[in-house]
Structure formats: C-alpha cells, structure tokens
Swiss-Prot record:
GO terms for cellular component: cytosol. One of its GO terms (molecular function) is ribosomal small subunit binding. This is Ribosome-binding factor A. SUPFAM superfamilies: Ribosome-binding factor A, RbfA. Monomer. Binds 30S ribosomal subunits, but not 50S ribosomal subunits or 70S ribosomes. Keywords: Cytoplasm, Ribosome biogenesis.
Length: 130
C-alpha cells in the first residue's frame, strides 16, 4: 500500500487556520478577565498534538488573561474540532507574546541613542556630520 505524500506547508496552513478560528472564538467568551486579545501567532507541533498560541493584550493583565484563556482552552479546542476538517485537533497552550513590548523598548533605546548623538554633535562647535 502506498503512503500518501505529505502536503507541503500543511502545518503552517493549519496554524494559520487555528489562529483565525481561535481569534473569532475568543470574542465569544464571556470571561471578564479576557480583555482585548490579539492572537499574534500559532505554532503547531508536527504531530498536531499541541499548539502554542501567542497572544497580546491591549487592556487587562496578561497573567490573568493567560490564566483565563488556558482555562477556556478545552472549550476552544472543542469548538475548533467542530470547525476544522482535520483528524487531530491540537491541545491549546496560551502564552503571552512580549514581542510588542520588546519592540517598543528597542524603539525607545534607538530614539534615546539618536537624541544623545544629536546632542553631542550640537555640543561640538565646527563639527560636521559625515
């Protein structure tokens, strides 16, 4: 019996679909600890057993939101099972994504360095920029 060939980029497509569906399902949750949540990315294991769902929060405490989302993971997985056309629906693990915070911190550091450089250039009379 011939084995089926692997579908190229299937894991990425499944992760993208999970991201879209989970984002829609989170809006239906009634838990007040879940504020304005944005699903940033989803990483699915090769066997589709587990999925890390990275999220950011505009309003609310990230730790409380993560706890609430992880408590609702069973409900979300069950709802995904009804929506997705795959044999194995992964167990969802929610993690707060700090990428936005890090980007803001780096942006502030770059701005500070540029301001310091401009101030140093102004302090040196007769200095020209290269």
């Amino acid at each position: 019996m011939k084995h089926k060939r692997a579908i190229p980029n299937r894991g990425l497509r499944v992760a993208d679909q999970i991201q879209r569906d989970v984002a829609g399902l989170i809006r239906e949750l009634k838990d007040p600890r879940i504020g304005m949540v944005t699903i940033q990315a989803v990483e699915v294991t090769p066997d589709y057993a587990h999925a890390k769902v990275f999220f950011s929060v505009l309003i609310g405490d990230p730790a409380e939101c993560a706890a609430a989302l992880n408590e609702a993971a069973g409900y979300l997985r069950n709802s995904l099972f009804k929506r997705l056309q795959i044999h194995t629906v992964p167990t969802l693990h929610f993690q707060f994504d700090r990428t936005t915070e890090r980007a803001a911190d780096l942006n502030a550091l770059i701005h500070q360095a540029n301001a310091t450089r401009a101030k140093d250039a102004d302090d040196q009379p007769g200095a020209t920029e290269a």
